[in-house]
Amino acid sequence: TPHRYLDKFTLFSLKSGKHVFVEKPAAISFLKIKNLIKKVNSLNKNLKIQVGFNHRFHPSIIKALKMVKQNIIGDLMYIRSRYGHGARKNYHKEWRMNKFISGGGELIDQGSHIIDLSRIFLGEFTKIDSTLKSFFWKSKVEDNAFLTLKTKSNKVAFLHASCTEWKNKFSFEIFGKKGKLEIDGLGGSYGKEKLYFYKMSKNLGKPKLKIWNYSSKVDISWKNEISDFVRSIKLNKRVSCGLKDAYENMKIINHCYKKIKRL
């Protein structure tokens, strides 16, 4: 769904007494997401609103998060992630690269996913640096976004989102003091989804390696997130990814768009 209409559809559905599952980023801009939250709160309805950051529900991410919470790789230090695709002919004419409809380019598109994942592993970011650039596509929005995000405790996320990644790529690496977790692939055109665990020994040197393969023919993250949404309704529990997450995500994106740096 084009970003420009997400907040309007959400409010319309809530006023009609419906629970809402809204695609990320939930609104076209930071101002729109702030206004949406205010309006939702004023409705005072006991309705669920879940935001569709489906990458949280990939089995490799679920497994990695569980391992981090169990302190298997020790205290986290930093994250490094690359996410990109090669687009298609005349991609610059599509709505995703029309700022009026999308709100931005690759940062708000694929970039929002790896920002979201970085948040759930490292926490909130207090320092943001970014470089946004259109290298290839003739568009007024960026086709590449480079971000360095830092938490209050100086944990760092290095993120690169691109639609000039000629071979589709998803890589998400989590570095801890006892080891490293690496998620590679999402299935389909992004290659088989795998989770690598590099366990460091006390003497360092070559780590032990364990690999989990997730070879489902379909992307089950969509099914997982909808099942999670339905469960939150049936059990009347808090949604796992709500408007607060969309707000924090868009706050970072807004900061980047306000302070664009050219290469």
Regions found by a protein language model. Give the residues of each.
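Beta-loop-alpha module in the N-terminal Rossmann-like domain of NAD(P)-dependent dehydrogenases
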Residues: 1-38
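Short glycine/proline- and charge-enriched loop/turn segments
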Residues: 17, 93-101, 204-212
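Hydrophobic residues in well-ordered beta-strands that form the structural core
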Residues: 22-23, 49-51, 183
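A short acidic, glycine-rich active-site loop
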Residues: 23, 100-108, 211-216
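C-terminal helix-rich "cap/oligomerization" subdomain common to oxidoreductases
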Residues: 34, 42, 70, 152, ...
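Contiguous beta-strand/loop segments that form the cofactor/metal-binding neighborhood of enzyme cores
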Residues: 116-189, 221-238, 254
